[in-house]
Amino acid sequence: MASVRNNRLIKFIPGIFFLLFGCAPVATSLPKGTEYDLSARDTLEKFIKAHHIKDTFKAVARIEINADGKKYPIKVAMMLKRPSFMRIESIPVIGLPDLFLSANNDTLKIFLPKENEFYLGRPSRENFSLFFPVNLSPADVLSIMMGIPPLPDVKLRWKESVEGEKLRADFFSDDKKILTLLMDGNNGRLKEIVILASDGEILHTVNYDDYCQVENIDLPQKITILSKGKNSTIVVRYSDMEFSKEENEALFDLPIPVGVRPIIMDRGSSPHRQGS
């Protein structure tokens, strides 16, 4: 069932990704070649101004998914709010949206109107990867799209170095490198995120390009995500970017349509309709 759904839904895959970088001058504040013990929170605060983290990011994204030797273009509207609130819907050329998605700390919901299918489950990477060609949780996806490294909330060791004209920061957990950041040495803009497995294998590479300013914040208008495990490439191009102060978290919760029985994604190896 999952393989059929992957083929059917891949054209609906929402772009995974927003950005809040202009604040990445973390690299310039550390002596080259030194090491520091710091928490994930400390690290993220080096990259983002605290008052912007609280705002909701809104944008239109044109996304091209390359997977299984095919290309799937899609246009979506999105709202993203840290730490884990996500709301996305497709923008069709004509007719009604093909995809609605919401995620928060507890729940992932996906509604496909054409199939009249509503999926409900935990916001886990296993559930998310049933539909989208990335082995990432919704929270990790949100961080990547906000230009924030998806670090675990544990003690990390950070080692910084210089790589050509770029500043490099490697993050270690239990002496194993889990993530590498590359930043422009001239302006501190985040250029690349490399996510690694515990054995050192590269799982995902994220590249950021075409920066512009939104409310005096440098934001990349283009994000490219390479997922080795899924053998996929996703290119996201943003427009109409803005920040707003959305206090109503209910806006990020997708209601179950009347008459539609939810398909629960956490029961066994494949989703089951509620009550079956």
Kindly give the residue locations of the regions a language model identified.
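Sec-dependent bacterial lipoprotein signal peptides
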Residues: 1-23
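N-terminal leader/targeting segments and the immediate start of mature chains
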Residues: 23-73, 256, 266-276
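Edge/loop elements at the starts and ends of beta-strands within beta-rich repeat scaffolds
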Residues: 49-57, 69-72, 79-84, 186, ...
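One face of beta-strands
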Residues: 55-63, 74-80, 84-90, 99-101, ...
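Buried hydrophobic packing residues in well-ordered domains
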Residues: 59, 88-89, 108, 141, ...
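Hydrophobic lipid-interacting interfaces of membrane-associated proteins
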Residues: 62-66, 93-95, 110, 213, ...
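An acidic-aromatic
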Residues: 85-139
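Gly/Pro-enriched, hydrophobic low-complexity segments
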Residues: 157-259, 263-264
